[in-house]
Amino acid sequence: MSERTEQESYTDKIDEDEILAGLSAEELKQLQSEMDDIAPDERVPVGLRQKDASHEMTVRDCTEPESEEEIDEDEILAGLSAEELKQLQSEMEEIAPDERVPVGMRQRDQTDKPPTGSFDHRSLVEYLYWEKESKRMLEEERVPTTLLPSQKTNEEHEAKNEDKVEELELVYEEIVEEVEGGQGDAVVDEVIEEVIMEVEEEDKVCDKPVKTDLDATDPTVTSEDGLQRPSESADANVEAKTDQSGLDTETKVNEEKKEDSTEPAPSSYENWVPEKEERVISKLKIPKLALGGNTFVKKTARPSGNETNLESTLDKIRNNNPSVTDVNLNNIENIPKEMLLDYVNSLKKNRHVKTFSIANTGADENVAFTLANMLKENRSITTLNIESNFITGKGIVAIIRCLQFNETLTELRFHNQRHMLGHHAEMEVSRLLKANNTLLKMGYHFELPGPRMVVTNLLTRNLDRQRQQRMEEQKLQQMKEQRKVMEMYEDSLNLPPGMLEMLGGYIPLSLLQNCQNGAEDIPEDSPEPSPQPSPPHQLCKTQHLAPQQHPPNLSTGNLFEEVQLKKTPKRRDPLLEWNQCDERKDGRPNVHLRSVPKKRSIAREGPVDERANLKDMIKTLKPVPRRREPPKVDLTPRDHLLSEIRQSNVAYLKAVPLPKILESQETSLF
């Protein structure tokens, strides 16, 4: 109780009024702010209990002129270098950022690397435009839409307006700081200038003087917030000049200043005014893609990079121009469907186009059916590429069905369609391809393993047939060349035509040597020299049939002694023929004579008989089997026991002695 009474007596001794009376105005404000934080007023909403720091700062600045007189900010700023000013500016942006700037844009630029190129605002806007258009085109592909008549008329009006002169509107936002002071105060005024520039002509720039107006509603800005870096403002000015180069501009200026401005205080930093910051809002003319003046080309189509001139190429195909052998329309998404159908129809009678590619052109079922009809009549196209389109299984099946009437197409590609082909369509494709013998390549991955294997086997079959045809053509070419060689030798040897063929293609070596000697002895003045003999590799077949040695000193008259001629039936002598009437009268029997082949000399038929006898002897021989003896294996007692058990019978059991190896002390009975 004693302690409590002491505390009460101590509080009674403290007079709050005297304490508050002894405090200065600054201490009273500080005490009030602390009391607002410790015990806020409950009648004030929670969201409004936060104290206004900016108001306190302004009041403190107004109520403390003495402290500001002691610190001269202008002198301090004037003594700083350009690098120190930049560092101070960056630090002030981090400590007290501008509340009018969005939070996401308050991050300062921390890159030290110099820019690789100048900033191109126009290219950035075009890039954003094409990004937006690509998304819109994807949405159009997902949900097909049809334009109403009112929408079509609106688009026509927009197209007409785009043809007129576009206006480029540039809005410059200039921040001008003026250091003004009164009674030792340094107040910085912010002047915002908006420059609206309109384009009229090129290569002319007109500048007008700046008009200033005062407005009391502009908030006060401190020197820290309004300080601008000279280098950044200069860069912004250079960017603005690059954007407005070559454009005629008209400027209209509105400026705002703070009310009750006083004369500027003398300082070495007061004449410096930062460069203006420019905010450019431009209306750009998007290029309208006109393809050969066609009126039904999409206005929002993306550039494909394909430089094919559609109209001139179509005219060449219709006129059957032989210079056009490869038609490439890939990635032209804005090609009209009517023009695509005209291309396909014009290829029906064309005889020179070998490759036709329409990948990623938006081809649909109508184009697929037209392609099928074209393949029935066309006899020149070898490669067809219709990948990345909107063709369904029905269109693909129609094209494959028409391949049974086409014998020139060797490569077909239809992969990556918008819709799946389907299992039924894959089975139908594998079935229809059996009737085609010329297709060698197919650009499609089958989902089912069955059709995949069937199509693979069919393409392999077609490749084998093509290889066989190529081999047959080579054989025919070789036969033609050999026939020419034989005719050449017949002419050189003065033999009747077909003589060497009757001889089985055999040409004696002596004839060849004489032909070569004769060809060498022919004078150069002879008008028709005998043809030279063919290379030895073409005569190897004719020489190895009956190789014989001939003496080198044979005369030209005995050349045909070694040639074996075929025997032809002799004609009967009419003097020796009997008259049939006389035979009937005399009653003589009819006698029919038949020719008996003469026996050849033994000397000539000797080697032939020996060969025949040798062949007969070889036929009588039989292969002698090599009977190898089985390897000797020593049988163990266990094997003997098992063999005896296998040979024994249940009805006739007999005692079998136990082998000594199997005996042991456990099994022994004694």
Swiss-Prot record:
Q: Where is the composition biased (Basic and acidic residues)?
A: 40-63, 97-112, 153-163, 205-214, 249-261
Query: Which Pfam families does its entry note?
Result: Tropomodulin
Q: What happens when the gene is disrupted?
A: Morpholino knockdown of the protein causes short bodies, bent tails, and reduced tail birefringence, consistent with abnormal skeletal muscle organization, in fish larvae, 3 days after fertilization. Larvae exhibit reduced trunk size, that generate less force than that of wild-type counterparts, and aberrant accumulation of alpha-actinin. Mutant embryos show abnormal motor function, with reduced spontaneous coiling and diminished touch-evoked escape responses.
Give all residue intervals belonging to the WH2 domain: 637-656
Expressing tissues: expressed in muscle (at protein level).
Q: Which GO terms describe its cellular component?
A: cytoskeleton; M band; myofibril; striated muscle thin filament
Q: Which InterPro entries match?
A: LRR_dom_sf (IPR032675), TMOD (IPR004934)
Q: Which residues form a coiled coil?
A: 150-183, 464-494
Q: Where is this region: Disordered?
A: 34-72, 94-120, 139-165, 202-274, 517-556
Q: List, in alphabetical order, the Gene Ontology terms for molecular function in this entry.
A: tropomyosin binding
Biological process, per Gene Ontology: actin filament organization; muscle contraction; myofibril assembly; pointed-end actin filament capping; skeletal muscle fiber development; skeletal muscle thin filament assembly
Write out the entry's keywords from A to Z.
Coiled coil, Cytoplasm, Cytoskeleton
Q: Where in the cell is it found?
A: Cytoplasm; Cytoplasm, Myofibril, Sarcomere, A band; Cytoplasm, Myofibril, Sarcomere, M line; Cytoplasm, Cytoskeleton
Its predominant location is cytoplasm
Q: Which family does it belong to?
A: Belongs to the tropomodulin family.
Role summary: Essential for the organization of sarcomeric thin filaments in skeletal muscle.
PANTHER family assigned: LEIOMODIN-3, TROPOMODULIN
Q: What is this protein called?
A: Leiomodin-3
- Provide the species name: Danio rerio
